[in-house]
Amino acid sequence: ERATARMKDPGDGGADGQQLSQHRWKGARSIGLAHQLNQQFIELCCEPSLDGASGHPFPVVASYRDLWSELDPRARQRLSLFPFVIVDLRFGDVAWWRMVATNGTHARSHVNGAAPTARWDWLALETLMFGWQVAREDRSVASMIFAMPPSVADCIAALTTRQVRTLAIESAKSLRLRWDNHPRLWRELL
């Protein structure tokens, strides 16, 4: 009888399969935001006005311009469903973030090319705000969602909201597609 009661208890994630485990991953609620950010980034990358001739800021996107432009809305959504963020704002660059933490928010980008529109500035702001929020809540989740080393998460978590806004706009040119140094991966995904 005791075993039967346990199996019917919906609060323990038991044998009835109706409830999720009580031990959910801390970052589970961030996945939806990662999908939204990915979707915005993919939409910007697919814009026909951004071609190789106009100096697209992402070489891997310019290289496969035809594949990106052929993505229909459903394919774009599927591509956005990675359980992590595919937008990178130098989250793996420990030295750069330490410099920002030491010198304030006036760290200029070292990326060639110009950000094509203010929409990229907004994407940079949303990316950094999301990274900042996650880094403040849980460094291990920041590591998984953004591939952010703990020392970078510490630097980002210590920023003020004003610093986040300023840094995002100043660093919009540093936005890049995650794994952009692996064009074959992106060709296969597209």
Tell where the protein language model's regions lie, with residue ranges.
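Generic secondary-structure transition motif, activating predominantly at the C-termini of alpha-helices
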Residues: 49, 83, 135, 160-161, ...
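Amphipathic alpha-helical packing elements
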Residues: 120-169, 176
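Residues that form generic nucleotide/phosphate-binding pockets
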Residues: 44, 134, 167, 188-189
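Exposed alpha-helical structural elements
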Residues: 74, 141, 163, 184-185
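Membrane-targeting and insertion segments and their boundary/processing signals
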Residues: 102-105, 109-113, 126-130, 138
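Structure-specific DNA junction-binding interface
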Residues: 1, 6-109
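Surface-exposed beta-loop interaction hotspot
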Residues: 114-120
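Long, compositionally biased
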Residues: 79, 85-86, 169-190
